[in-house]
Amino acid sequence: DGGIDYQRLSPTIKGRMFTLSYKVNTRPQTSDSYSEYDIAYGHDDWTDYLRRLQDQHNDGSQNTTEHTFQADYTTPIGKLHTIESGVKYILRNNSSDNDRYLRTAADNSDYVFDEEYSTHYRHQNDIIAAYLGYGLKWKKLSGRLGVRYEHTIEDVKYLLGRGDDFRKNYDDVVPSASLGWKLTDLSNLRLGYNMRIYRPGIWYLNPYLNDSNPSSLSQGNPELDSEKSHAFDLSYSNFTPKFNINVSARYSFTNNSIQSVTSLVSEDDIPDLSEDKKTGKDVLYTTYQNIGKSRNLNLSAYVNWNATKDTRVYANLFGGYTSLKGANGLENDGWNLFAYGGAQQTFKHDWRLSMNIFGQTPWIMLQGKGSSFFSYSLNLNKSFMNRRLSLSAFASNFFQKYNKFKSHIEGQGFIQDSWNKYPQMRFGLSVSYRIGELKASVKKAARTITNDDVKSGGGSGAT
């Protein structure tokens, strides 16, 4: 990642500023998996298919590269009013290459490249946006109104594999509004509304058909539309030198939510599955669709307590209720809890020790629920040479080598439970050294680039 901001303040009008920003971001990922089959003990019902079964080697790489250019202008009008405007251009290139290699099952021969089932997919997403905002400050009251226009250009190409190239353009108008009331010099109350657009990431879009498990296939959907989410929130904050707290209640809804959908289907209903890959039986097929209606009610709190000049305790708590409804009568609802907390202690001679704990309950999905999660870490830091040299040691999840994840999905005619475990024990050391003297603090630009429009998660369509 990298970026640069240029900001110019008016020498005559306080609060008037002009900012130019550029940011580049890239997120490469690779995967390498082998699926080898022992066909000697297959059930008689699967004999015909097992004779055609082949070992698989899947070599995959996904990457998203963003270039963002942004210009912002802010100016006061009198003592009470502020006008903001700006333009933004995002050039987002998604790429996904999945190469498949095959050999006869239970054979030690070399793998051979399978061009028919390999895919090289490109998805270019250009976003042109402009916004206009108005701000008001009058006594204890403050308010903001804003509107943003976005024009999106999508260009999809298949360099290798099945799929038709396509290009589409669409427009969105995104409003926002907020109202604040200053209760005291240290506390505030705020009411707000905003609309958010979440574009599917490469994991959701990847069209590669993963059939390494012949009874459970998965595939992304390159024709997904962006989610449009509406949210209302009410928050209270109070900040003192000793104690800080922020409490927020939030309600949000989405009518075209991107959801993972698993169905028990005939293999003839999977267009990218060739005849020689079919088992002759119904199979589970997972993909993503814009079918979900999501309703979320959340309550969150952040607390920071400076117990002494050397001791700090902090916590971030979240509780929410989610209701999901999709096509074909699919629906699910439930509660989700999240907690993050820790403490930091400073000792003599610039020794600092911190401990953090994180946990969450299973998250709600349209057809089931995901896994709970628990993690913890310790960090020890020591400064030397008038804080020029810093040494840090950290350890996380040191009592348990693996973290186990469990998910439960059910639909018409099937129930699927899966268990996975991943290494989670971490140890590390870091060293930093500051060269030169910092005579004054470096000022940051008041405006900079933030891109948070990509929906995270996904992965069923990739190896």
What are these regions (language model features)?
Residues 1-157, 246-248, 295-318:
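Face-selective signature of the C-terminal outer-membrane beta-barrel domain
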Residues 8, 24-30, 89-93, 138-140, ...:
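Transmembrane beta-strands of outer-membrane beta-barrel pores
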Residues 153-155, 185-230, 251-280, 396-412:
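Surface-exposed extracellular loop regions of Gram-negative outer-membrane beta-barrel proteins
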Residues 384-463:
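C-terminal beta-signal and adjacent terminal beta-strands/loops
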Residues 57, 66-70, 112-119, 221, ...:
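Outer membrane beta-barrel strand-and-loop segments of large Gram-negative receptors
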Residues 14-16, 80-83, 140-143, 186-189, ...:
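Repeated loop/turn-to-beta-strand initiation elements of outer-membrane beta-barrel proteins
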Residues 2-8, 69-75, 130-136, 177-181, ...:
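Residues on the lipid-exposed face of transmembrane beta-strands in outer-membrane beta-barrel proteins
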